[in-house]
A protein has these predicted regions:
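Short amphipathic alpha-helix that is part of the acyltransferase structural core
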Residues: 1-32, 119-165
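A structural microfeature
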Residues: 51-53, 122, 164-166, 194, ...
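Conserved acetyl-CoA-binding loop-helix of GNAT-fold acetyltransferases
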Residues: 77-90, 181-184, 190-207, 225-230
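Conserved beta-strand-loop-alpha-helix junction that forms the acyl-donor binding cleft
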Residues: 99-110, 214-225, 241-244
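Conserved active-site tyrosine of GNAT-family acetyltransferases
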Residues: 109-118, 228, 233
Length: 244
């Protein structure tokens, strides 16, 4: 088995990775994808021209890298991922920690991170409020008490909402909105101000265009997760975040 290392992928390598992903998705209907463009290091395990395992390392900060890896279903439990991981760690500073996102629909992935001794940090929930639920909130919030600012993050158009108690951001996409950066000021939490701000923002979006609203929330933040569920958001997928 040969393990190649690069900072970018060739068209041929991408094609091989897509075939590998297809084999994995057929075995387990996971939602994880492979970052073919933005990673800092790519490690590919080959045997006789056949791609057995692909891993990507993406720098999060000076001492933390996110690791995304897929191994062919018929090649698992043979030490291939372990060999790729060892090679990947040799590229990084000695005290580097790795983050793994694991779809609970993949028992093999859960088994792999457990065998590594990785620590479960949190469950990350992708949630969505359907467009009809957004429409139903129209007129419920007093949007007159809301400041709305248009801005750009790189090439992405966003709306920044704020009131006297907090703020949140909405990324604008053609088919949906993405909610992030929801903060209520210290000392004002647990008093209903988060619910009020969220309803005002959703009412504004319903007036603008009632598209689905998506977000990613941490299972470790119980109050926020409870707020989203009370407002009508539903879990669409759950990824477990592990630290190694």
């Amino acid at each position: 088995m040969d393990i190649t290392i690069s900072s970018s992928l060739t068209p041929r390598e991408k094609d091989k990775i897509f075939l590998l992903l297809d084999a994995c998705y057929k075995k387990e209907p996971v939602s994880l994808t492979f970052p073919t463009e933005e990673a800092d290091h790519y490690l590919l395990a080959w045997e006789n021209g056949r791609l057995l395992c692909a891993a990507a390392l993406l720098k999060e900060d000076e001492t933390v890298y996110e690791c995304t890896a897929f191994t062919r279903p018929d090649c698992r439990r043979n030490g291939i991922f372990g060999a790729v991981l060892e090679k990947g760690l040799s590229l990084l500073p000695e005290d580097t920690e790795l983050l793994f996102y694991v779809d609970k629909k993949s028992p093999d992935a859960l088994e792999a991170v457990t065998a590594l001794g990785a620590e479960l940090l949190s469950d990350e929930h992708m949630m969505e409020l359907a467009s009809d639920a957004v429409s139903a909130i129209k007129g419920m919030g007093k949007t007159g008490y809301l400041t709305v600012t248009e801005a750009m993050e790189g090439e992405q158009a966003i709306l920044v909402f704020s009131d006297a108690h907090g703020s949140l951001n909405i990324s604008l996409y053609g088919t949906h909105y993405y909610l992030y950066g929801f903060e209520i000021r210290e000392g004002q939490r647990g008093q209903g101000f988060g619910t009020s701000l969220l309803i005002k923002v959703l009412s504004f979006l319903a007036e603008r265009e009632p598209l689905p609203v998506t977000l990613q929330g941490s299972g470790s933040n119980g109050p926020a997760h409870s707020l989203y569920k009370k407002t009508g958001f539903r879990n669409t997928e759950t990824l477990s975040r592990y630290l190694y």
